[in-house]
Structures are given as C-alpha cells and as structure tokens.
Amino acid sequence: MVPVVALVGRPNVGKSTLFNRLTRTRDALVADFPGLTRDRKYGRAEIEGREFICIDTGGIDGTEDGVETRMAEQSLLAIEEADVVLFMVDARAGLMPADEAIAKHLRSREKPTFLVANKTDGLDPDQAVVDFYSLGLGEIYPIAASHGRGVLSLLEHVLLPWMEDLAPQEEVDEDAEYWAQFEAEENGEEEEEDDFDPQSLPIKLAIVGRPNVGKSTLTNRILGEERVVVYDMPGTTRDSIYIPMERDGREYVLIDTAGVRKRGKITDAVEKFSVIKTLQAIEDANVVMLVIDAREGISDQDLSLLGFILNSGRSLVIVVNKWDGLSQEVKEQVKETLDFRLGFIDFARVHFISALHGSGVGNLFESVREAYDSSTRRVGTSMLTRIMTMAVEDHQPPLVRGRRVKLKYAHAGGYNPPIVVIHGNQVKDLPDSYKRYLMNYFRKSLDVMGTPIRIQFKEGENPYANKRNTLTPTQMRKRKRLMKHIKKSK
C-alpha cells in the first residue's frame, strides 16, 4: 500500500499551505483564518519517484465546542489512518498549551512523528524552535511553507529516509496505479480514442446543493462512516473534499462540496473561495448529484446551480433529500412543483431519499452509472448518420427562402457530454424548434439517460466557390467557334 502522511496541529499553523506545497496543487483552501479546514482532505504526493498520500486536517486547539469538536475528531481519525505524522507548530506564536496536548496524544499513539516548526521566515530558526524541544518529540524541522523554504530539506531528510525503510513492494501497487490514472486525467493526458476505456477510470461524482441540504450526511451515508463533518448549521463544509471509494467493483471519487448561496448573501471571503471550489468541482466531475431539500422546495438558487451544471455539460442525478416525515399531501405538492419547475430536465433521474436514515440511497448509484455510461458511450459515424436520416424522414427540415435545408451526415464531436456534429447546407438557418427535435430524437434513439446531448451544425462548403475553371486549348477553340456562330445568327 502507498504510505499515508497526516498533517496535524493547531488551527492556522499552515497545514493546508504545506499540503498544497507537497501535492503541488491548490486543492486545499488557504487563508489567514483559524479553523478553515474542517474535514480530512487527501492528496497525492511524490518524492524521487516514491508516492505517498498526504492528509490535510482541521486544527485542534483543545477548546472545541459545536462543529469544532467534530473537526478535532476528524484530525484524530487522520492520525489513526496515517503511517507517519507531521506535527506542525507555529514558530511565531511560540509554544501553546494545545501543542502540548497534541504532543501528549501523539506520544501515546506510538506512531512515527516528526515535529515541523512553520512560519520561521524572518526569524532565527535555531532560536525560534528552542521552546518546542520540551514537547519531547526529538529533532525539530524549521520551514516556511508559504515560501517553500525548508520543505525540500524536510522531504529529503525526514520523509524520504522513512519511506526507504519501508519494505520494497515487488507487486504493482493498486493505489499507485489509481493515483497515476487520477493525475493523468487531471493533467489532460488522454489516451488515443481507439484505446480509451471509460470503465478503467474512476467515476468522479460531485454532490452539490445549497447550504445545509444534507450533502455531507449523504456522503457519510454512502461511505458508511463519519468521513466529513456533519452539523446542523449552514456552511459547515467549506472546501471540496475528494474521497476515493469503491462500490460494487467500480471505483469512484466522491466530491463533497460547500453549499452555494445567492451571490448577494455571500459576504465572507472564505465562503467566496468555497463557492469557487464547488463550481470547479462541478467542472471536474463526470456526474453531479444536485441535492434539494424537500422541506424547502426548489429555490431560484437551485435553478441557478442547475443551470451551471447544464452549461458545464455534466451528467446529472437529482436527489430530493429529507423525504422522510412528510405527509402524503406535502409529497404530492413537492412532486408537482418539481414537474413544474424542472420539467425541462427530462433526461435526469429524480430520487426521493432520506440521507439521515438511508432510505432510497442504495438506488442512487444505478442512476450514476447509467448517466456515466451514457455520457462516455462511443457511437460511430454510420450509426449517427443513420439516426439523422431517420429523423429527417420522420420530420423534414423547414423551407428557408423557398429552399429545403439539407442535412448530409453526422459524426461524434466529443464525449462527456456527448456531442453530435451535423454537416449540411443552410443549417445556420434551422429554427430552434427543429434543433430541439433532433436533440430529442438522438436521445431517444441512443437511449441516453442522465446526460445532456449537444448538437453542433457545420455548413457544407462549396468546393468550387471562388475558383475559376481554366480552359484547355481544345476548349478555347470550341468556345471561339461557338461565339462566331452566335454572332452570325444575330
């Protein structure tokens, strides 16, 4: 197995900054704001070809109440998961009682622990770390994570020797293969189309919705563990949490996102960052679960978020949560509202669930797989052209300036979402109603469910446009004789 490194410490000591530095990403939110990271966050890192998984955690300060108590629990769980712990302290703030409490807990776990003193930029490192020797964790490694100073030394003198002590693995590591695939997809390194197998890649599933609709509760229900912080307060999740998982022999990357509110209500800068992360997660996902609160109904913000999902071309599963406890009359009213406000989304499955009690959750993944398979299915040019021809035979394109629009052939233009490119004459003059007819015809013929279909039209070019035919000498002589004959006849 790939070794796991956990970053733990008080709030705002720079754990997320070091996480971003180690994973060479900006996946963890970073701001000068205590308690910003609330959930365990995983990332892939590498030292001289040796891979490891890095876990970013929320801070522990010993005064937790409410949601902060759950944050501390997440950090303690990360310690249990890890093979080695990087215990981070703030060199500028000095030794704090919470540092001593964390050190005591780490000593009791008997796990390899390295003490890292962050924020030493502008300080004398030797002088700044003196007080931390009283924690009894051995040598201290001074760094400035925001500038990268000391991080390379930390990798070379701490993590690399520790990893080299691990027994070498002769077999190919499944986790290493997974993260290699994950990184290749993130960097856009796609295989040749003929060799592409969508079933070989994990399905990225983003769970999105307004604040406090039950996204993290649903995530924990799916995973069967308290993996992300759940608290009855809007805005508990601030970052997008990427969680690898497997279900029924299929690999997934579950993305729990922050809730998205109306722009006018977002005043906290950290929340603005969280919304950006949510929108990026939608762009990054293969399938999006839009969670709606059955007790509050469909808001304009739900429709706005739905519009972003559709514009991104992502596959969609609509989840109506908190269905338990509603009277039959209220349920019928909710369904009528759904039909009225979401009637234009006729391709997405709608599930009525209770994430808290688990009812209906088991059926979600059937729709997720259906949507993913539909969005990545390869269809040949002959099949698409045949469907287009049948659509034209059933309903001819309209006349434009007395001439019939002619559709010649169709081919695939992309996947996730499926794109059909149709070539023809005067296609730019096709009315929107006929374009919708073609889109629905392709959807029904290809049995596409859970994903939007996009149709692009390309005008057929006249190969003789702007070209003049050059006459041969024989043709020139014939032309002269013809012109003489015409003049004589006049």
Curated annotation (Swiss-Prot):
GTP 2 binds at residues 209-216, 256-260, 321-324. Associates with the 50S ribosomal subunit. It comes from Escherichia fergusonii (strain ATCC 35469 / DSM 13698 / CCUG 18766 / IAM 14443 / JCM 21226 / LMG 7866 / NBRC 102419 / NCTC 12128 / CDC 0568-73). GTPase that plays an essential role in the late steps of ribosome biogenesis. GO terms for biological process: ribosome biogenesis. PANTHER family: GTPASE DER. Residues 377-461 form the KH-like domain. Belongs to the TRAFAC class TrmE-Era-EngA-EngB-Septin-like GTPase superfamily. EngA (Der) GTPase family. InterPro entries: G_ENGA (IPR031166), GTP-bd (IPR006073), GTPase_Der (IPR016484), KH_dom-like (IPR032859), KH_dom-like_a/b (IPR015946), P-loop_NTPase (IPR027417), Small_GTP-bd (IPR005225). Residues 3-166, 203-376 form the EngA-type G domain. The keyword tRNA-binding does not apply. GTP 1 binds at residues 9-16, 56-60, 118-121. Keywords: GTP-binding, Nucleotide-binding, Repeat, Ribosome biogenesis. It comes from the Bacteria. This is GTPase Der. GO terms for molecular function: GTP binding; ribosome binding. Pfam families: KH_dom-like (PF14714), MMR_HSR1 (PF01926).
